Amino acid sequence: MSKVTELKMRLKRGEVYRRSDLLQWSNAVDRHVVMLVKDGTLQKLATGLYYYPNVSVFGDTPPEEAALVRSFLKDDYFLVTSPNDYNSLGVGTTQLYNKRVVYNHKRHGEFKLGGKTYTFMAKHRFPKKVTPEFLLVDLVNNLDKVAEDHEFVLKNVSTRLKTMDLKKLMRALKEYGSSRAKSLLTPLLQKLEVNHAN
């Protein structure tokens, strides 16, 4: 059995591999990877990042986004979101963006992975999953990056605050808010808290 065939037998469908992951099974990893990409076994996603595709009735399926980002970062702690998620808040954002944002601790910048562009943002703190409270704080953090009128969005944010869980919102603001977001939202939240207490 050839070394390439031996390497091929160790691969699992649907998995994303770094070049370094394949070193344990190959004595000539670069040559073997080139051969596997050439014969269609592996797909090159980015420099040093490869995918062994699952096959469906429609052909090869793309890698799962979480597996792709996890392999790229070599880390499990990240949050993938999109400016499109702001539209779910009902605060007047309606634009659709072809952009994915990855909050993480390791990388910063734009990277093309598997044909999609991801904006990696190195942040000290971010939640494990997206919540409406985090989204609202994140929207105010990134207000300068949305296409809609900022005053209009902020007016709608102040209205939306009234329907949200104040404790969760204050915690999200404290943990994830920029100084600008804190200066804009803290007075509104304090006013709501006083009104809620009365």
Label the model's feature ranges.
Residues M1-L73:
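Short beta-edge/loop segments at beta->alpha junctions of small alpha/beta modules
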Residues M1-V4, D30, P62, A66, ...:
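Alpha-helix initiation and N-capping motif
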Residues A28-V29, G92, S179, N195:
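Short coil/loop linkers at secondary-structure junctions
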Residues K44-N54, L68-G114:
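Short gly/ser-rich loop at a beta-strand->alpha-helix junction or flexible surface loop bordering the NTP-binding
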Residues G114-A122:
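A short, charged helix-loop
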Residues K123-N198:
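Hydrophobic alpha-helical interaction segments
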